[in-house]
Amino acid sequence: MQKLMGLVRRCVEDYNMIAPGETVAVGVSGGKDSLVLLQLLAGLRQYSNFKVEAVTIDMGLGMDYSGVRKMCEKLEVPYTIVETQIAPIIFDHRKEKNPCSMCAKMRRGALNQAILDRGIHKIALGHHYDDAVETFLMSLIYEGRISCFQPVTDLDRTGVIQIRPMLYIHEKTVDNFASRMELPVVENRCPVDKITKRAEIKDLVYQLSSTYPDLKERIFGAMQRYPLPEWEPKGRYKRPKDQE
């Protein structure tokens, strides 16, 4: 856990993500990524001067977050669940054929409003190293753009700042940590889970990596060396090596 907290701390410092005394909300979906982020940021509090809260947007899919609530109690992290009808609106009323974009937009809006209601302006999201590589390739292949989400995103119109402290941690490492710590991962009941464009890109990266083992490292490094907007680290970044 110390090694992973070190990677998070380095990412936070490289991109000036958290100011002293600040309160950061963690967007907790119940998936392994957000739970690992919550665990690591909660642990990092003892070394850095900031506070952590957890916020979940209940999509209206009947998911059980009782395990997450117990985890938050153990970590002494305030936990808020906001109940919505986002899933029924998208799948039952609108019957969207391509629901992912609208779902993400509605979920982000609900999450931003939830933290603002609590007087918080910074939200930590659980995107990791592999997510960044896959998002870059999705933009290139599906949209013809050189683009990716930013480590720190200032949503000017909302007053919310998004941060992604796990960008130096590989997905495999996240999976292993979640399993080892027996984190209370919530079953995803989304009807289109694992049949998205991201899943297609993940499979493509897996196939290409068998021939080009350093593919992900080269893409991630290129994003920083010839930086996309806001991707050049301010600190002394070193490329994450094999973490297992």
Walk through the language-model features, giving the residues of each.
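Short, basic, helix/turn surface patches
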Residues: 104-116, 152-158, 205, 209-224
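Mobile, glycine- and charge-enriched loop segments
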Residues: 77-98, 160, 222, 229-242
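The feature marks non-catalytic terminal segments
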Residues: 183-244
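Catalytic subdomain that performs nucleotidyl-dependent activation
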Residues: 51-52, 130-210
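Short, solvent-exposed coil/turn elements at secondary-structure transition points
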Residues: 58-60, 85-87, 155, 168, ...
